[in-house]
Amino acid sequence: MIPAFEAIKALNTNRKNEIVVGTMTPNRYWELISDNPGKDLPVFGAMGKASSLGLGLALAKPKDKVWVLDGDGSILMNLGSLITIADQKPENFCHFVFQDGVYFTTGGQPIPGGETVDLAGIALKSG
């Protein structure tokens, strides 16, 4: 597994002009290194909603690419968004989920299925 900060650095290096919607653990790192903070939309107060917000931006701004930087606990709070995203099929949307097995922001409690859940599999089966 790639450490979250290393993955964030790689994304920042490869970023062109994408709008970045970040939440929870990945956003904590993203805010430290983003080269284009004017195109960043941090959503700390909306745990579980970054995917929905990112989808809305992608649909409203089809010429702009939108990246969502999400946490595993956050996406588990809104798994239904994966079905909605799959249904809309936005070509300008990319969802990155960082898996650390805990609700970091609320004190590090383990997430349900933290060691066994297959988030990539859930996303693929969602469409």
Where does each model-flagged region fall?
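Acidic-glycine-rich active-site phosphate/pyrophosphate-binding loop
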Residues: 17-36
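Active-site pocket-lining segments that scaffold enzyme catalytic pockets across diverse folds
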Residues: 1-17
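Thiamine diphosphate
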Residues: 5-9, 32-127
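Short hydrophobic/aromatic-rich motifs at helix boundaries and adjacent loops
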Residues: 1, 24-28, 91-93
